[in-house]
């Protein structure tokens, strides 16, 4: 097996590391899997521990998607393998082997993957999230909007079928992981950014 193929399991294992749990334990915060929305992600950590903890979680989760792709770029891997490596990191965050395959929703890790594909694509997705969040104050709605548009951004900027397909699958999984949020949005029960979830 060519050594570059080992980047797929490496990306998955790195994705399986929970930044939210590590940050929360380090800072003495409640376990985000047990408190708040019970999602080990930056938004829940923001509610439980404030901006500093949330930023550290966001950077950690995004790095899980970005680092394997930076390594892959340095090895000049093929486009299909490059796409698979990014997708593996994302799946690792959603279904982590270290936490009984119960992970987060993948927003920050998906951002890291998109930045790894091409930084302008990641920037466009981030600006979409920020714009929707500024207008509506819903983290989940912002994530859904960015997820829906991400494959379009990849297609327009990169034109790579492999990367478009990988991004499309990431987007579908991300939307699926937000099904509870979608139900609450439709019922008018979703917590806005800055609100404490009890």
Curated annotation (Swiss-Prot):
Disulfide bonds: none annotated. Signal peptide: none annotated. It catalyses: an acyl phosphate + sn-glycerol 3-phosphate = a 1-acyl-sn-glycero-3-phosphate + phosphate. GO terms for molecular function: acyl-phosphate glycerol-3-phosphate acyltransferase activity. GO terms for biological process: phospholipid biosynthetic process. It is found in: Cell inner membrane. The chain crosses the membrane at residues 3-23, 81-101, 113-133, 153-175. The keyword Repeat does not apply. Coiled coil: none annotated. It comes from the Bacteria. Pathway: Lipid metabolism; phospholipid metabolism. Its EC number is 2.3.1.275. GO terms for cellular component: plasma membrane. Its main location: membrane. Keywords: Cell inner membrane, Cell membrane, Lipid biosynthesis, Lipid metabolism, Membrane, Phospholipid biosynthesis, Phospholipid metabolism, Transferase, Transmembrane, Transmembrane helix. It is a multi-pass membrane protein. Probably interacts with PlsX. Belongs to the PlsY family. PANTHER family: GLYCEROL-3-PHOSPHATE ACYLTRANSFERASE-RELATED (PTHR30309:SF0), INNER MEMBRANE PROTEIN YGIH (PTHR30309). Catalyzes the transfer of an acyl group from acyl-phosphate (acyl-PO(4)) to glycerol-3-phosphate (G3P) to form lysophosphatidic acid (LPA). This enzyme utilizes acyl-phosphate as fatty acyl donor, but not acyl-CoA or acyl-ACP. HAMAP family: PlsY. This is Glycerol-3-phosphate acyltransferase. It comes from Methylococcus capsulatus (strain ATCC 33009 / NCIMB 11132 / Bath).
